């Protein structure tokens, strides 16, 4: 008789978690006490929610807003990423003295280069310039499309008010960011760009030489990532750049893969004080993400379900 092969995977706990009581089976506190105000971790192979901490809590989106701008771009222009636009002067005042990739007004960029700038450097001018150009200057119309797509993806606690995240009206939740990231991961270009430790921006009209954009997701960089580096890290973005002289909360949305198992990590509003790696640039949400990556891959494993035709 032909053996029946099961088509689903089951999530099983390894020996390291067997000592925990059933009620704490998916609680990382025995390994690490999560300090973020909300968090959501999901295994994308099984859709099992591995960890949920107040995941519907509404929080400031900040730079994570760019994920929605990129989602809208890829939805409409995924096959046109090498098309070009000119960085408009009109957005200069709005993004002045904020996170950027030194993309100057009247310089010409491809859509792809703008995505690199957004994903690697959280560049506000890349998001606003692209949105302004593609909308014909109708930024309100672009934002309306962002909200429509967000709802189509399935978000229920998110509101978008600009293309880059500088406006405080941009709000989201951990579970919504999971849905948005999962949608983005369906685009090969997004996956490829997110995983790049660095990108060389070609020379432009006001840049006589090419220049390098280093990915702020230092967990991708074995050379310079230090204690943050994780081989399993595939890509991610924070709501703000690393802290140095100021203090505050930070959020990080990312995904990791090890031995064929993929997890999405949405860690929202980690306090500055939780980063104990000791570097001058503090990355509290990335710190908590790396600790939770360690917990997940040390505690869980994906195994084939039992063959129902095999005798025990």
Language-model-detected regions and their locations in the chain:
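Positively charged n-region of N-terminal signal peptides that target proteins for export
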Residues: 1-8
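Residues in well-ordered beta-strands of folded domains
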Residues: 14, 86, 161, 220, ...
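Domain-terminus/edge residues, biased toward the C-terminal soluble/receptor-binding domains
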Residues: 155-156, 168-312
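Active-site-adjacent loops and short helices of periplasmic peptidoglycan-processing enzymes
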Residues: 23-175, 179-188
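Residues in and immediately flanking transmembrane alpha helices
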Residues: 15-16, 79, 307
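C-terminal segment of classical bacterial N-terminal signal peptides
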Residues: 14-23
